[in-house]
Regions:
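N-terminal non-globular leader segments, chiefly Sec-dependent signal peptides
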Residues: 22, 28-31, 103, 110-111, ...
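Extracellular beta-strand/beta-solenoid scaffold signature
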Residues: 68-73, 95-104, 126-143, 158-167, ...
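All-beta strand scaffolds that present successive hydrophobic residues in beta-strands
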Residues: 60-62, 82-85, 108-115, 148-152, ...
């Protein structure tokens, strides 16, 4: 019976099916390389339109621009994070400036943020009012200041309040960064290196150690503020100090109506200029230049050496002790003790030495060429005034 049944099956029914293999399988989800770069162990951030929260320690990088509609763009909530923005730009479309481009949780440690841009829509109306869209802060922290945090090669533009604020706490560093058009502080950290902050509503750059920086404030307190400042420039377009430091080396500062450069303890190889305030002030001045249109060129409460002060309608140089100095103004140079100095006055005294003048020369138009209690080997001359006024004269004329 079985043989009979088999005999009725056709040849086609006994033939094999199509032996040609199908094509390669089509991908139905992300490849491994899209999630993880075998040559780069960092974690990719692929989000482009909503807030990113980093809550696990590690190294992260942004793969594209990120735009949020409100609040913070990136929240870092854990220690030990390195965030590379990959040269991309973080923006916000919030109608009123709110949130931060990157916000650090309170008291975070060991965080690095680098290589990117944070852009808001805040502008300055040229009379000190900042308003607009986007972010309130560029990079900021909540509550307790961070420790051992570095921000490098980041630009922040158009934020309502702070640009990059890490506080002047322990081991915070901002380097190679740029900030423009923010309503309060531009950059604030314990160390600031090779940075520029301009058009800031308050202090443009502030740090304990500041070097190779430029800070310009429109209406604020200081163009640049630091404890030890080197190779830097600060400017205030209004009533703020151009540059303020405890120790300033190779620096310059300008101000419209306050101190151009103010160095509490010492200024060396520095320049200060002010329209209606003092050009340069310090307790100790060495190899400096200060100028003012209507106040004092250089004011020194200690010793000024190898320095020059010029004032169009004020006192050129005023020091407790002046050595190898030059002053030019309505009154040229004033000191308790003057050594090897030159002073030129238009209507006031050329050189005024409250105690002793030695090897000095003073000239004036209508005032007194040289005034001293004791003058040794000095000379004074006046066009229409008095050449010399000396109580004890030693070889002076």
């Amino acid at each position: 019976m079985l043989a009979c049944l088999l005999s009725f099956q056709s040849a086609d029914s006994l033939a094999q099916g199509n032996l040609t293999p199908p094509g390669a399988p089509s991908p139905t989800m992300h490849t491994l390389d899209q999630i993880y770069d075998r040559g780069d162990p960092r974690i990719r951030i692929t989000n482009s339109s909503s807030t990113v929260t980093i809550s696990i320690p590690g190294s992260y990088f942004l793969t594209q621009d990120l735009t949020v509609s409100s609040g913070n763009a990136i929240n870092i909530t854990t220690n030990g994070v390195t965030l590379d923005l990959g040269g991309h730009t973080i923006t916000s479309t919030a109608a009123s400036a709110v949130g931060a481009g990157v916000l650090l949780n309170s008291g975070l440690k060991n965080v690095v943020i680098r290589n990117g841009n944070i852009v808001g829509g805040v502008t300055n109306n040229a009379v000190g009012v900042y308003s607009g869209t986007g972010f309130a802060y560029g990079i900021y922290y909540s509550s307790t200041a961070p420790v051992n945090v570095c921000v490098s090669k980041v630009s922040v533009i158009g934020c309502l309040y702070y640009g990059i604020d890490l506080n002047a706490g322990d081991a915070t560093l901002v380097e190679d960064c740029f900030v423009r058009t923010v309503g309060s502080y531009g950059i604030l950290a314990s160390t600031v290196k090779n940075c520029t902050a301009v058009e800031c509503g308050y202090t443009s750059i502030s740090g304990d150690q500041v070097s190779d920086c430029r800070g310009e404030t429109t209406f604020g307190s200081y163009g640049l503020f630091g404890v030890n400042v080197q190779n830097s420039y600060g400017s205030s377009a209004s009533s703020g100090y151009g540059l303020y430091a405890y120790v300033a080396l190779n620096c310059a500062g300008t101000s419209a109506s306050s101190y151009g450069l103010y160095a509490y303890y010492s200024a060396q190889n520095c320049q200060g200029q002010s329209t209606s305030g003092t050009g340069l002030f310090s307790r100790n001045v060495n190899n400096c230049y200060g100028s003012s249109s209507s106040d004092t060129g250089i004011e020194c409460s200690g010793t000024a050496i190898n320095s020059s002060g010029v004032a169009s309608s004020g006192l050129g140089l005023d020091a407790y002790c002046a050595e190898n100095c030059y002053g030019n103004g309505v009154s040229g140079l004033s000191a308790s003790t003057a050594l090897n100095c030159l002073g030129v006055g238009s209507n006031g005294d050329g050189v005024y030495a409250g105690l002793t003048a030695m090897n000095c020369f003073g000239s004036t138009g209508a005032g007194t060429g040289l005034v001293a209690f004791i003058a040794s080997f000095c000379h004074g001359t006046a066009t229409t005034g008095t050449d010399l006024s000396v109580t004890h004269n030693i070889n002076s004329y």
